[in-house]
Amino acid sequence: MKRTVISSSNAYASKRSRLDIEHDFEQYHSLNKKYYPRPITRTGANQFNNKSRAKPMEIVEKLQKKQKTSFENVSTVMHWFRNDLRLYDNVGLYKSVALFQQLRQKNAKAKLYAVYVINEDDWRAHMDSGWKLMFIMGALKNLQQSLAELHIPLLLWEFHTPKSTLSNSKEFVEFFKEKCMNVSSGTGTIITANIEYQTDELYRDIRLLENEDHRLQLKYYHDSCIVAPGLITTDRGTNYSVFTPWYKKWVLYVNNYKKSTSEICHLHIIEPLKYNETFELKPFQYSLPDEFLQYIPKSKWCLPDVSEEAALSRLKDFLGTKSSKYNNEKDMLYLGGTSGLSVYITTGRISTRLIVNQAFQSCNGQIMSKALKDNSSTQNFIKEVAWRDFYRHCMCNWPYTSMGMPYRLDTLDIKWENNPVAFEKWCTGNTGIPIVDAIMRKLLYTGYINNRSRMITASFLSKNLLIDWRWGERWFMKHLIDGDSSSNVGGWGFCSSTGIDAQPYFRVFNMDIQAKKYDPQMIFVKQWVPELISSENKRPENYPKPLVDLKHSRERALKVYKDAM
Ligand SMILES: Cc1cc2nc3c(=O)[nH]c(=O)nc-3n(C[C@H](O)[C@H](O)[C@H](O)COP(=O)(O)OP(=O)(O)OC[C@H]3O[C@@H](n4cnc5c(N)ncnc54)[C@H](O)[C@@H]3O)c2cc1C
């Protein structure tokens, strides 16, 4: 990702000024009660497991089965963009164009639109970061231009209510229907959209499906995964909760498609439209409120290029130069050894099908080696992209993990220490453990840290500090440019031993070993913790003493976890 080059002292100065702003650490301690006054309980979560409560994804599928498409009195087709802000290989958009072409044969005046809906309350409830929202706003402007070249206007609708309402509410359904009616001048509209797998979003879609009528028909599609949720099950038809066997099936599934084509994944490319609708391209009037931008360093921030082309060229660069070294370099803290594609993937500026198709070209015809341990660098890169699918599948299978609950419900009994002062020090990079502080400061300053960094800091928070992993999970969402609830919950569950296919509880990262292995010359640490630049082996006065003793805190974690599990 292209970012401004900053000197270490700038980084620290900027972090200090940000500290003055960051005051409400309590918001990370629990779900926001304004939006979730009655959070799900362990019993409620178990209802999904014992099938006494239907999973939202199943409800969507059931409702969709009953649907029939009718073009009667329909004049408008509209694609509703969500986390799929791209033209290239977008299933819902592709279907939208196909439906429109069918409709056009019946109604020569039919129109095709695209829409994006802003609900700031959804952003607040989900703790979307300023970095990510700024990226989305830039991407929308760019998308508006690209769509205009296809003669498709992109509308921006804002849903605001005085009482802070999420989009899974009946108020939203009314708002949405009314907006559609206005666009189609009182006739019917067909909406296409790609499914988002978090429960709030699925319940929003369910509500809309339940309120379908002749004025509004909704068509939802699987798009964000390479293999859609529900397609990979064990031979007994149950859901996988362990990655490796799931991944082997995933590979089989993908290879099966490849047998009949030259590509490994099917891409959905829209043909040029024979359609020449003219309209005035008006700049969007919306600007992000300050509350979402307060954590962004004003003087130095630099967003990655938001265009679809930038995502493609980033992929090309990565596959051309770095991917062959991925196995050795992906974890190094001082190198950019990974693709840096996550913000593009999270916001949907690039499809993971396209990524895997392109990466596959350098895999000698095999997406995975016969023995997993022999996977080449590029094969392992594809495997990482598969982890993203895995976590999405899991969120559909265990929906309570999208409602603030751990996958392993027994871990609710862990007696967290939850020291708010220790939490603040972790958040702001002042724990006195250099590697943790360097990573947390980088996160604050840039909105991005690599996977190893996320694992190190998540392990430190949940094990060494014994702070409920959900505090850290929320902090990450609020500060990551690529914040994605299923991967974030999945990653935190893995590191804190509370989630799906997690590390065993007795695996506690040793911070000294992590530092020696992934930043042996302290290049990364000295960049972000400039206090340590000139300190040979002595701890300088202006750098905090370690918040915990690593050995003692490890033993404490083992005991507390063991007592609960
Ligand atoms: C505690 C924790 C929190 C995380 N939170 C997020 C998050 O909010 N959003 C997010 O996109 N990823 C998250 N991850 C996964 C991973 O760290 C990032 O996807 C990755 O660091 C992004 O950088 P990259 O694009 O350069 O990755 P690359 O190594 O180049 O990987 C390419 C893509 O594969 C996917 N991917 C890679 N590793 C993982 C993984 N372990 N799990 C799921 N998908 C993966 C991502 O889409 C990534 O962009 C988290 C991991 C942990 C341990």
From Swiss-Prot:
Cofactor note: Binds 1 FAD per subunit. Binds 1 5,10-methenyltetrahydrofolate (MTHF) non-covalently per subunit.
Pfam families registered for this protein in UniProt: DNA_photolyase, FAD_binding_7
Localization, UniProt: Nucleus; Mitochondrion
UniProt catalytic activity: cyclobutadipyrimidine (in DNA) = 2 pyrimidine residues (in DNA)
Region feature (Interaction with DNA): 384-391, 451-452
Superkingdom of origin: Eukaryota
Enzymatic class: lyase
EC number: 4.1.99.3
Domain Photolyase/cryptochrome alpha/beta stretches: 75-226
Keywords: Chromophore, DNA damage, DNA repair, DNA-binding, FAD, Flavoprotein, Lyase, Mitochondrion, Nucleotide-binding, Nucleus, Transit peptide
Residues the record lists as binding DNA: Q514
Family under the similarity heading: Belongs to the DNA photolyase class-1 family.
Summary of subunit composition and partner proteins: Monomer.
Any further remark recorded for this protein: There are only 150-300 molecules of photolyase per yeast cell. Present with 688 molecules/cell in log phase SD medium.
Listed name of the protein: Deoxyribodipyrimidine photo-lyase, mitochondrial
Gene that encodes it: PHR1
